[in-house]
Amino acid sequence: MPRGDLCTRTLAMPADTNPSGDIFGGWLMSQMDIAGGVLASQIAEGRVATIAVDGMTFHRPVYVGDTVCVYGDIEKIGNTSMVLHLESWVLRKNQPPRIKVTEATFTFVAIDAEGRPRPVRKDEADV
């Protein structure tokens, strides 16, 4: 079962494939970054920036027509940063209900209008 809450859901399209016809790993990573940004923005109650991606693991390929669902879970909230565990699962015709395809740890920092780090108030981090 997916770990965390559903952050985004999108359909893998032909334009997102690599030369072998599978979905390009960079596209999947960008979907995870978008999903993590959604969750981190909610936690920070404002603008955030990705500062690190660790342990990116591609378990299975993603195919055209798969519905890609990205789930996020809070691992740690610091003074200005948030560490999130993100997992991508697909819904695929004629397959088990969900298949985990990718996971990684993303770190985001809360930033102000000038792009400088700003505090994340831990007492308001209930998402």
Where are these regions (language model features)?
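Hot-dog-fold acyl-thioester-processing enzymes
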Residues: M1-A52, V109-V127
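HotDog/MaoC-like acyl-thioester-processing domains
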Residues: P2-T8, Y63-V64, E75-V127
